[in-house]
Amino acid sequence: MKINMLLSGCLLGLLCFTACDSEGNEMNDYTHYVNSFIGTGGHGHTHPGAMVPHGMIQPGPDTRIDGWDSCSGYYYEDTTINGFSHTRLSGTGCADFGDFLLMPTVGEQRTEFLGTESQKRPFASAFSHEKEQAEPGYYSVFLDTYGVKAELTSTERAAMHRYTFPESREAGFILDMDYNIQQQINQVMEVEAVNDTVLRGYKRSAYWAYRQDLYFYAVFSKPFTYTLYTDTVQENDKQIPVCKMLLHFETAKDEQVLAKFSISSVDAEGAYKNLQAEMPGWNFDGVRADAKKKWNECLSKIAVKTNNEDQRAIFYTAMYHAFLSPNLFTDVDGRYLGMDLKVHTTDMKHPVYTIFSLWDTFRALHPLLTIVDPQLNTEFIRSLIKKHQEGGIFPKWDCVSNYTGTMVGLSLIHISEPTR
């Protein structure tokens, strides 16, 4: 009897959710209900980064390097921040990424090697949760060590940083090319200053994704001078390459310095095109507002009517996490890296996605999408079919066009059957 009553209540609630009127949704700010820090402690492996739904780029804070609870790069109990990288996973049991870490600095820029067991870079900053804020599409924290306020937001393929500096003749940034989440192997690292406001670079690393190729294009609002720091350090029987770009400039009190980063798995030209298409200007607040709008479009697909604010926060935070991945993997010109690790081109009406944790998501995420966004679910299935055509088999767990082989079964069957 109790079980039947509970099931009836759940079904009744579902009908209320799916029958909600769209006019009411547009008037409500559903991002207000999301707590981006839920899941960042314990073994949740989530992060408070500034993403848009299914974004290719995931800018956010990085607080730890190694161990199982470093999977997203951020752990709530940590008290220092290494910087802000542009790629990360959410809610997974495996780790990767943490690419192109940017850290604002004031004073000496330390680069010494602290060993692979250290969770901190020498330039890490202390921070407190009292001076930290996160909401869908936006992240902010005050870096106590440097007296700098950091803010992040993003579009699908590009991130914008805004840093408020104190007065200093020794302000700058460290772009840490060799930074990774967990102990990856950096096979190639290249970075160059195109001029005194533009950097571009490339990195190939091997870890869970056995070959990850990633390019970036970055533009800064303030001219800089730079020092390229490279080295090879010995630890036990390992030779570990080091590559960092140190940027230098002067700042006035409360001067804001902005940076725009875009990425591509195809080439630097792809990263450049992504930035030009999605972030041609410097309107940080406008980009943030657009990100909020995109999140409200997702979250408003289900309207929960309850006076219990805790239940509302739990629900919309879970829904927020559901729309973080799979991730867009197609540049604005339609090019992407296929499962054969060759460059392909697709019709932009049908972009290709990656990060398919199918063993996890076939149970609940994809059934949810058949209700709230069946067209997007169809696009995911279309991507998986292309991956079969390119690589010869369907992936179990596709990670940036790498067959990781993680987990068991062929879960694509379960998610494609309802669309037939």
Residue locations for each model-derived region?
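C-terminal motif of bacterial Sec signal peptides marking the signal peptidase cleavage site
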Residues: F17-A19
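Bacterial N-terminal signal peptides that target proteins for export
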Residues: M1-L7
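Accessory carbohydrate-recognition regions in carbohydrate-active enzymes
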Residues: G24-I413, R420
